[in-house]
Amino acid sequence: CCSQDCLVCIPCCPN
């Protein structure tokens, strides 16, 4: 999830 698409995985990427 939090690897390439941070836009799609918001819960995974707080920043």
Curated annotation (Swiss-Prot):
Keywords: Amidation, Disulfide bond, Hydroxylation, Neurotoxin, Secreted, Toxin. The modification Asparagine amide is found at N15. Disulfide bonds join C1-C13, C2-C9, C6-C12. Expressed by the venom duct. It comes from the Eukaryota. One of its GO terms (cellular component) is extracellular region. The keyword Transit peptide does not apply. Its main location: secreted. The keyword Transmembrane does not apply. One of its GO terms (molecular function) is toxin activity. The modification 4-hydroxyproline is found at P11. It is found in: Secreted. Belongs to the conotoxin M superfamily. Causes scratching in mice. The cysteine framework is III (CC-C-C-CC). This is Conotoxin QcIIIA. It comes from Conus quercinus.
